[in-house]
Amino acid sequence: MKKWGVGFTLLLASTSILAKDIQLLNVSYDPTRELYEQYNKAFSAHWKQETGDNVVIRQSHGGSGKQATSVINGIEADVVTLALAYDVDAIAERGRIDKNWIKRLPDNSAPYTSTIVFLVRKGNPKQIHDWNDLIKPGVSVITPNPKSSGGARWNYLAAWGYALHHNNNDQAKAQDFVKALFKNVEVLDSGARGSTNTFVERGIGDVLIAWENEALLATNELGKDKFEIVTPSESILAEPTVSVVDKVVEKKDTKAVAEAYLKYLYSPEGQEIAAKNFYRPRDADVAKKYDDAFPKLKLFTIDEVFGGWAKAQKDHFANGGTFDQISKR
């Protein structure tokens, strides 16, 4: 028994010595703080159990466009978890991510989805029920800046798509609608969380155009006695996307753990954590479990209405695009 005890102690000691300490950096968009705080703990425990290695994941959050620029400019992110595919494509165009990144994981590398809804003050004093209510005189709207925020670009395109569908796909009328909406915007923050703080903490505005997960978080954390969620008749299917940053993981030799980190988002535990943080899960079993948490509404996609992100970016958010045009007062 003594020999066995000594041998077991030595085995534990050698295993401890062989265990590696690994650090990853996840550069993410603005309102994913709570999601990844919870997910990172779960993945670290999973990886420890699978390999014996200790992995610590650091986080960086901000407007998705600004975050993509920081990775392009050299911040050593092992993975990016950004608001939309265009921002990952922008990094790929600079050679830091493989150009076929979107096909490396299921569902076009979007492990969870969301949509765009409205957050209003309790009692809905301005009677906001659908997109057309946002252009009424005297309605103060809060949304982030599409030049820096991925969520803001989803907001903008959701409004544009609604206007198209209610004006026989007339692009000029859709532009007039979105221009009228932005005339009612009181504050343009750089990111989605900043806009939430403007509306919730600073008390500015009658309605916040928000990620569904952000609106649900606000009502659940700050009280349903203060805010209400209004789900419009239709909105856009928002698909946040993820990728390893190839140049960084090759340099740091973190490819295996970085890939596993993203793949685990699709696991039952990863999907459960996404749902608990108010993202719509891809996994059918998890989605069924949380079915009552997510209202039914008509959803259109970026490809169906705008021809994909590259075209949407060029038409609407590049210099001289429709956002610049409607911003001229």
UniProtKB/Swiss-Prot annotation:
Signal peptide residue numbers: 1-19
Domain of life: Bacteria
Pfam family name, one: SBP_bac_11
Family membership noted in the UniProt record: Belongs to the prokaryotic sulfate-binding protein family.
One BP term from GO: sulfate transmembrane transport
PROSITE patterns reported in the protein's UniProt record: PROK_SULFATE_BIND_1, PROK_SULFATE_BIND_2
UniProt keywords, alphabetically: Periplasm, Signal, Sulfate transport, Transport
Single GO term (MF): sulfate binding
Keyword Nucleotide-binding: no
Gene Ontology cellular-component annotations: extracellular space; outer membrane-bounded periplasmic space
Record-linked InterPro entries: Sulphate/thiosulphate-bd_CS, Sulphate/thiosulphate_BS, Thiosulph/SO4-bd
Location of the protein in the cell: Periplasm
Stated name of the protein: Sulfate-binding protein
Function, as annotated: This protein specifically binds sulfate and is involved in its transmembrane transport.
